């Protein structure tokens, strides 16, 4: 089973000038969050090697935006709750006509592929680029992850990695290529599922003072991380 990587600065583009918040201190695996503010008229260009990017627009007022992605162009106002999906190795450029705030969610592309391999029994998965469109699930998940980083609670690591897994499955269901668009395979629970769940609950209660991870709990229950 491929374990998600911890995304360090070497994996990420340099965006410190507009950065307001980062999950670097959260010690998450498979996902990295950034919260940015960009002034009017700034232009961004980006190509990610081994990461998928979800950009969650949080600006309260509509803002005209011009985006170039994968050889296509779109010019329209973006609104709060819009999300655009930039897969790995896809060229992207944008310019805004006003100041904006947004959340960036970087996902480990190898981990997303591993989730697809286990859930869909397929290694021919391709996440497709999507211009901004409303996606309530990604929008709310982005806000939850941002709140988790701000809170720095004891369940921060487990919380973040669980939501990262949910985002990976959501991507495969709604933003993947034709070969990935079939329904996720249903996996029958093992006979010991209930006892495993109880063991996990007991373990969390006993170790509530620790920053537990999703990987640690999956190993405890001898269950797949996915």
Question: Where are the regions that the model predicts?
Answer:
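Short, Lys/Arg-enriched N-terminal segment that forms or immediately precedes the first helix
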Residues: 182-186
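OB/S1-fold single-stranded nucleic-acid-binding modules
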Residues: 1-14
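N-terminal positioning helix adjacent to the helix-turn-helix/winged-helix DNA-binding module
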Residues: 137, 141, 189-200
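Short amphipathic alpha-helical/adjacent loop interface patches that line ligand
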Residues: 109, 164, 197
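N-terminal regulatory/effector-sensing and dimerization cores
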Residues: 11-127, 152-153, 157
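Amphipathic alpha-helical segments enriched in hydrophobic/aromatic residues interleaved with Lys/Arg
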Residues: 121-180
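Basic/polar phosphate-binding segments, predominantly the helix-turn-helix DNA-binding elements
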Residues: 174, 199, 203-226
């Amino acid at each position: 089973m491929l374990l998600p990587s911890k995304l360090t600065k070497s994996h990420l583009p340099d965006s410190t000038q507009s950065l307001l918040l980062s999950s670097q201190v959260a010690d998450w695996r498979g996902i990295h969050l950034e919260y940015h503010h960009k002034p009017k008229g700034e232009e961004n260009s980006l190509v990610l090697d081994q990461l998928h990017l979800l950009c969650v627009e949080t600006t309260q007022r509509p803002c005209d935006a011009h985006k170039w992605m994968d050889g296509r162009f779109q010019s329209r106002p973006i609104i709060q709750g819009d999300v655009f999906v930039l897969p790995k190795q896809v060229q992207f450029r944008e310019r805004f006509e006003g100041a904006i705030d947004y959340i960036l969610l970087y996902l480990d592309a190898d981990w997303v592929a591993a989730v697809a391999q286990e859930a869909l029994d397929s290694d021919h998965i391709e996440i497709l680029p999507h211009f901004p469109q409303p996606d309530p699930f990604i929008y709310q998940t982005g806000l939850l992850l941002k709140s988790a980083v701000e809170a720095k609670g004891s369940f921060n690591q487990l919380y973040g990695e669980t939501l990262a897994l949910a985002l990976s499955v959501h991507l495969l269901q709604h933003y993947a290529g034709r070969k990935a668009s079939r329904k996720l395979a249903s996996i029958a629970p093992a006979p010991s599922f209930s006892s495993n769940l109880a063991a996990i609950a007991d373990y969390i209660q006993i170790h509530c003072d620790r920053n537990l991870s999703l990987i640690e709990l999956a190993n405890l229950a001898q269950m797949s991380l996915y």
